[in-house]
C-alpha cells in the first residue's frame, strides 16, 4: 500500500497539487485548500496531534503513510512528516488505498 501511496503523491507533486511539510499542511488546512493529508507513520506525537486535530476539525481525511525518511525519499526531499493533497480525485484515490 505504501508504494501506491507514494506513487500517487509523486503524481500530485509533479502536477503541483501537493503541499509538503507540516507548516504547509497546517496552513493549507486552515485555508480549507486540502482534500486529504498523508501523515508519516513515525511522525512525532506533537506533530501527529496538531495535524490530526486540525484535519478532523476541517473534515479532511487522514491517511497513514510510510515513515518520514521513505516518504521524503520517494518525493525527492529530505524526511517529510506530512503531505497535503489539494486535488480531490487524488485524495479519493489515497483514501481508497487507506481503506484496503
Segment roles from a protein language model:
Residues 1-39:
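N-terminal first-folded block
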Residues 7, 23, 27, 49-53, ...:
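Solvent-exposed alpha-helical segments within well-ordered globular domains of core cellular machineries
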Residues 16, 33-36, 58, 77-81:
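A generic structural signal for short beta-strands and their flanking turns/coil linkers
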Residues 30-53, 59-61:
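N-terminal positively charged helical leader segments and presequences
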Residues 51-79:
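Mid-chain, well-packed structural core segment of small domains
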Residues 68-100:
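C-terminal structural segments of small proteins and small subunits
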Amino acid at each position: 500500500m505504501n508504494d501506491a501511496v507514494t506513487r500517487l503523491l509523486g503524481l500530485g507533486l509533479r502536477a503541483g497539487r501537493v503541499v509538503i511539510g507540516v507548516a504547509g499542511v497546517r496552513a493549507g488546512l486552515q485555508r480549507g485548500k486540502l482534500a486529504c493529508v498523508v501523515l508519516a507513520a513515525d511522525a512525532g506525537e506533537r506533530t501527529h496531534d496538531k495535524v490530526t486535530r486540525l484535519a478532523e476539525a476541517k473534515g479532511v481525511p487522514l491517511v497513514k503513510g510510510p515513515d518520514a525518511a521513505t516518504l521524503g525519499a520517494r518525493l525527492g526531499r529530505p524526511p517529510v512528516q506530512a503531505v497535503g493533497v489539494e486535488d480531490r480525485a487524488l485524495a479519493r484515490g489515497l483514501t481508497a488505498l487507506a481503506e484496503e
